[in-house]
Design a protein with these regions (language model features):
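A glycine-rich helix N-cap at a beta->alpha junction
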Residues: 86-96, 161-175, 369-381
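Glycine-rich ThDP/TPP pyrophosphate-binding loop and its adjacent helix/strand module
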Residues: 108-264, 270-278, 282-287, 406-516
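A short, small-residue-rich loop immediately preceding and capping a beta-strand
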Residues: 39, 65-68, 111, 132-149, ...
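Peripheral docking tails and interdomain loops at the edges
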Residues: 272-275, 386-388, 406-407, 526, ...
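Non-catalytic terminal/interface segments that mediate subunit docking, oligomerization
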Residues: 248-357, 363-373, 471-473
C-alpha cells in the first residue's frame, strides 16, 4: 500500500496523477477488505464507490465543501483519504467507526447511520450557507436504495426550490441491501437503459438539472463530470451507474450477502461461507411463518428493505411468493401499510429492527394504535449490544410501551415466542408488538399454554419471600442468576417472568407486598420511561423498596456489553451488593 500510506489528507491526493489514483483505488479496496475481514462491516457498498469518492476529494475541497453521505455506511474510502487509514490497514485501529462521526474528523459534518436523511441535512446546510452569504459546494451522496425512503422524497422536493449550489450524486448500483423495490427504480432502470436520455425523468420533474454517467467506476470520467458542476449556481442531480462489490468477485456475485458482513468471511478470492448454521430466533420466525402460511394464505410477511437483518432469507422470500412484501426503505409506510392490511382482513407480520422503529412513532400511534389494528410487529435487536451509536436498540421499550392500545410482549424462550406469535396472528383485538430475545434461543421443551388474551398477567416461576425479582425478556437469564446468588446468601427470593411490557399485574404486585419488602426489576433497555419505572410508580409511597436495573439514557458507541453491564450494575454480584446495602439502609440510589 505504497500510495495509501502517503495520503494523510485530500491535499495529498490532489498531487497524484491519474495512473497513480487508479493504483490508489486498488490499494483502498485492499484496505476495505482488510477491515471487513478483521472486524466486519459494509463490504460491497464501499467497494462500489471507491472511484467516486476519490473523484469527489480530487475535484472538491473538503472540509470547506461539505460532503454528506446518506447512511454513511459507504464512507470507508472517504475516511482513508481524510487521515483515518489506520482504521483500515495493518492491525486496524478499532476506534475509527464505520460511519460519519464529527468527533473523528472535520470532514464528517454529521453523525450519520440511518437512511434517507442526506438530502434533508444537505439542503439545510445549503440554505444556511446562503443566509450567511458564504460560497462553497454542498454535495449529498445517496444510494443503496435510500431514495425509496420518505424523507428522501421530502428532501428532494424541498431542495429543488434552492436557487443556489446543491449537488446530489445518485449512486445507482441497481441494489438496495437486497433487490431494489418500488416504482422509482423502474424509472432509474429506464434512465440507465437510455443512457440518461429518456424523457420520463423523475428528477427533471422536480426541476433539477440532470447528468448521467454510465461508467460510474471510471475515475477519469467521474472527475470530468464532477468538475463540470463544481460551483454550479442551481440544484443538479448526477446519476452515476456503479457496480456494487466492484473489484472483489464474490461481492460482485453475491451483493446482498456482502452488503454488511461479519469478520472472517474474506479469504483471498474465495469467501468463507458457513454451513449448518445454528437455530436462531430469526430462523424460528421464518419457519413458523412458512408453516402458518401453508394453512392460511391471508398471512403476509413484510420488511422495509432489511430482509437479512430479520432473517427473511432468499429461500423464505421465494417460498412466500406474493405474500412476502418488501416496501423498500420506508418504515413509516410499512407501519401504515401493515395497519391497512390488518383492517381489511389480512394477517400481516412486519419484522423490523429496534433502531428503525424510532422512525415510525407517529404511524404506530395514529395509524395502528388509535385504530386498534390487529397487526403483528416483530422487533429484532432490542437490547444492549456493542453496536455503534446510530443503531442502538435500547429505546423501543420506552417508546412503544407508552402508546395506548398496544400490547408489547417480551418472550424469554423459544416456546413463549412461538406461542405469542401464534396468539398475535390469530387474535383481532389488539395491535401486538413482540420483542425478540437477544442471543441464542433458549428452549424449555414444553409448549407455552399461556392465554395472552388475559392481559398483563405475570408468571411466578419460583415463589418465595423477602425479595421479588421481575426479569423482563432477554434479562430473565440474568434474573435467574440473581435468584441463585440471593438463594446462596440465605434469601428465599421470588422469580417472576412478566411477559408483558405494556402493563402491570396489579393483583400480583399487591400480593407481593404481603411477604416481600424489596422488588428488583431487570430490563434490557433504558430505565427512563421503561418497564421498571412503572413498577416503582405503582408501589409509590408503600413500604416496598424498588431497585430498577437497566440502561442509562445515553448514546453509547461501540461499548462492549460486559462494560455496559458493569456500568449499569447489571451483574448478579453488584445487584446482590445493592440488596445488602438497601437492607442495611446504606444504598443511596434505591
Amino acid at each position: 500500500m505504497t500510495l495509501l500510506k502517503k495520503i494523510d489528507s485530500p491535499y495529498d491526493l490532489k498531487k497524484l496523477s491519474m495512473g497513480e489514483m487508479n493504483t490508489l483505488a486498488q490499494e483502498i479496496r485492499e484496505g476495505i477488505l482488510n477491515r471487513v475481514n478483521k472486524i466486519g462491516g459494509h463490504c460491497s457498498p464501499n467497494l462500489g464507490i471507491v472511484e467516486a469518492t476519490i473523484a469527489l476529494h480530487y475535484v472538491f475541497n473538503s472540509p470547506v465543501d461539505r460532503f454528506i453521505f446518506d447512511v454513511s455506511h459507504q464512507c470507508y474510502t472517504h475516511k482513508m483519504l481524510t487521515g483515518r487509514k489506520s482504521g483500515f490497514i495493518g492491525d486496524i485501529i478499532k476506534n475509527i467507526s464505520g460511519f460519519f462521526n464529527p468527533s473523528e474528523s472535520e470532514h464528517d459534518p454529521f453523525v450519520l447511520g440511518h437512511t434517507s436523511t442526506s438530502l434533508s441535512l444537505a439542503s439545510g446546510v445549503a440554505k444556511a450557507r446562503d443566509i450567511n452569504g458564504d460560497n462553497y459546494n454542498v454535495i449529498a451522496l445517496i444510494g443503496d436504495g435510500s431514495l425509496s425512503g420518505g424523507e428522501a422524497f421530502e428532501g428532494l422536493n424541498n431542495a429543488a426550490t434552492l436557487n443556489s449550489n446543491f449537488i446530489i450524486i445518485v449512486n445507482d448500483n441497481e441494489m438496495s441491501i437486497s433487490e431494489n423495490q418500488g416504482g422509482l427504480y423502474k424509472n432509474l432502470k429506464e434512465l440507465r437503459e437510455s443512457n440518461g436520455t429518456s424523457s420520463n425523468n423523475f428528477f427533471k420533474t422536480f426541476g433539477y438539472d440532470y447528468h448521467y454517467l454510465e461508467n460510474g467506476n471510471n475515475l477519469e470520467e467521474l472527475i470530468t463530470l464532477f468538475s463540470s458542476v463544481k460551483d454550479s449556481n442551481k440544484p443538479v442531480v448526477l446519476h452515476i451507474h456503479t457496480l456494487k462489490g466492484n473489484g472483489y468477485v464474490p461481492a460482485e456475485e453475491n451483493k446482498e450477502m456482502f452488503h454488511n458482513t461479519v469478520s472472517g468471511r474474506i479469504n483471498g478470492k474465495t469467501p468463507i461461507i458457513p454451513s449448518n448454521l445454528p437455530e436462531t430466533y430469526g430462523s424460528i420466525t421464518t419457519e413458523f411463518i412458512l408453516k402458518k402460511h401453508e394453512q392460511d394464505k391471508s398471512i403476509v410477511a413484510i420488511t422495509a428493505a432489511t430482509p437479512g437483518g430479520v432473517s427473511f432469507t432468499k429461500d423464505f422470500r421465494q417460498k412466500m411468493g406474493d405474500a412476502y412484501i418488501d416496501v423498500a426503505i420506508s418504515e413509516e409506510h410499512a407501519m401504515g401499510f401493515t395497519s391497512g392490511l390488518a383492517k381489511n382482513g389480512a394477517k400481516p407480520i412486519f419484522a423490523v429492527q429496534s433502531s428503525f422503529v424510532q422512525r415510525t412513532y407517529d404511524q404506530i400511534s395514529q395509524d395502528i394504535a388509535l385504530n386498534n389494528s390487529p397487526v403483528t410487529v416483530i422487533v429484532h435487536c432490542g437490547g444492549m449490544s456493542g453496536i455503534d451509536m446510530t443503531h442502538l436498540g435500547t429505546f423501543d421499550i420506552s417508546m412503544i410501551s407508552n402508546i395506548p392500545n398496544i400490547v408489547y410482549l417480551a418472550p424469554t424462550n423459544k416456546e413463549e415466542y412461538l406461542s405469542m406469535l401464534d396468539w398475535s396472528i390469530e387474535q383481532v383485538e389488539h395491535p401486538v408488538f413482540i420483542r425478540v430475545p437477544l442471543g441464542e434461543p433458549v428452549t424449555t421443551g414444553k409448549v407455552d399454554k399461556t392465554n395472552y388474551s388475559d392481559l398483563n398477567k405475570y408468571q411466578v416461576v419460583r415463589k418465595g419471600s423477602d425479595v421479588a425479582i421481575i426479569a423482563l425478556g432477554t434479562f430473565f437469564k440474568l434474573g435467574k442468576k440473581v435468584y441463585d446468588r440471593l438463594k446462596q446468601a440465605g434469601f428465599n427470593p421470588t422469580l417472576i417472568n412478566p411477559k408483558f411490557i405494556t402493563g402491570i399485574d396489579e393483583d400480583l404486585l399487591d400480593r407481593l407486598k404481603d411477604e416481600h419488602n424489596i422488588t428488583i426489576t431487570l430490563e434490557d433497555g433504558i430505565l427512563d420511561g421503561g418497564f421498571g419505572q412503572k413498577i416503582a410508580s405503582y408501589y409509590g409511597d408503600s413500604e416496598m423498596k424498588v431497585l430498577n436495573y437497566g440502561g442509562k439514557k445515553e448514546f453509547t458507541d461501540r461499548v462492549k456489553v460486559t462494560e455496559l453491564y458493569e456500568r449499569y450494575r447489571l451483574t448478579p454480584e453488584l445487584i446482590f451488593e445493592d440488596v445488602m446495602k438497601l437492607q442495611s439502609g446504606n444504598l443511596l440510589y434505591a
